[in-house]
A protein has these predicted regions:
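Conserved alpha-helix/loop element of class I SAM-dependent methyltransferases that forms part
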Residues: 12-27
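A short glycine-rich, Lys/Arg-flanked "PGG" loop and its adjoining helix->strand segment in the class I
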Residues: 112-127
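Single conserved hydrophobic/aromatic residue that forms the stacking wall/gate
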Residues: 1-7, 11
């Protein structure tokens, strides 16, 4: 199925998404994907788990494209997409069974407000599922990165800090999975393909610009060195 576009990008990998989805009973759940991008995971959840999924993103262009892709694969009745701010979610308290985030928090400076809002709109007994790139070491990070050209617009933090915020807002950790090796293997595969042909304009280059290769080199280097890590997991409210 066409869950994502040619930009089924470096981090929003369907394999990890499905692994995360299988960690709880998602059948028929109402789901909010915060920072949904082009909506790939939204369509996967709607199609395979019969979820009613709302995707929210700050980018109007991403929202427009996500709507078009969902209509193209006839999932527009199960998905909806709105432009909005992750630190001021336009929803009532206790609205969703599941909140889903994938590689979003790195661009959000106010982590406390971000996780406070996630807790607010999540129903009691609901689940927060995440897949994030996090700081692990204490060294400097080289830029550009896939999510930020400079350090001024990058707001990485550590897993312990994330856990502190979520615990503060009433969520209990159920599981945490290290996906770093998986990410390294995927990036190595990307570089192997780059040697074989020039990447198409509608692929990663379209999302990351002319510095795509350097961004991938930097993130791969930091994952290998242990400065950064990839983690997925589940919290319950």
């Amino acid at each position: 199925p066409l869950y994502s576009s040619a930009a089924s990008d470096v981090y929003k990998r369907q394999t990890v998404s499905k692994e995360l989805a299988e960690s709880i009973n998602l059948q028929g759940a109402t789901v909010l994907d915060v920072g949904c991008g082009l909506g790939g995971p939204c369509r996967m959840l709607a199609d395979e788990y019969n979820c009613q999924v709302t995707g929210l993103d700050l980018s109007n262009e991403y929202i427009r494209t996500a709507k078009e892709l969902s209509k193209l694969v006839k999932l527009d009745s199960k998905t909806s997409f709105i432009q909005g701010d992750a630190t001021s979610l336009p929803f009532d308290d206790n609205t969703f069974d599941v909140i889903w985030t994938q590689h979003v928090q790195m661009n959000i400076p106010n982590k406390e407000k971000f996780y406070s809002e996630i807790s607010r709109v999540l129903k009691s007994g609901g689940h927060f599922l995440y897949y994030e790139i996090l700081k692990k070491g204490d060294g400097e990070v080289n830029y550009p990165m896939p999510w930020a050209s400079t350090s001024e617009i990058s707001f990485l933090f550590k897993e312990t800090e994330m856990d502190n915020f979520l615990t503060k807002f009433g969520l209990i950790k159920k599981q945490s999975n290290d996906q770093t090796t998986y990410g390294i293997d995927f990036l190595n595969a990307v570089f192997a393909k780059m040697k074989e042909f020039v990447p198409p304009k509608i692929g990663l280059n379209a999302l990351m610009g002319e510095t795509t290769k350097q961004k991938l080199v930097n993130v791969l280097g930091h994952l290998k060195s242990g400065e950064l890590e990839l983690k997925s997991g589940v919290y319950k409210k």
